[in-house]
Amino acid sequence: MKILIIQQRYGIGDLIIFLPYIHAISKKFKTKVSLLVKESSKASDLLSNDKNIDEILILDKDKDGIKGFFKLSNEIKKRKFDKVFIFNSSLRYNLIAKFSGVKSVFQYPLFRSKDNLVHSAKIFTENVTGEIISTEPNLNIKSIHEFDKNIKHVGLGISASGLTKRWDIQNYIRLAQELKKNINVNFI
């Protein structure tokens, strides 16, 4: 069985948020999945060692507009996917999947404008798999650095792809100070 998951959000954080749901679909159908993602998600770098991922397809600008619709449809059609899971409510991706000859298309309800990213993905995936899904992401990284296991190691991602996702630098400083005060923590 060949499965495609479409996750068209821009950021690295967005991709990581969706990982538990991507993994759950892979496990449910006992097969690796292909992902259609934006280049800016860095999926090719982050997921190169992920045992649940077969192939990463990049959703770039040449797949925009009418010409892009047909180009993307042909790219999907060539791969002969059996199922497509669309993590958004876009009519465009629904039509692309159907135009590509995919028989089973699963997607959020069409035309939904307001959306809680984690809640919607969790409900969608739980409906598909019939199981409760943990929201804890798991990146399969090839080389693990030697870290002291008695210390919490925290990385702060202080940039974001969209203005609505950005937090003032002073907030990060206060967060780091509070964490340092209450937990044995090392910032990496």
Regions picked out by a protein language model, each given a short descriptive name:
Residues 1-188:
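Catalytic machinery of carbohydrate-active enzymes
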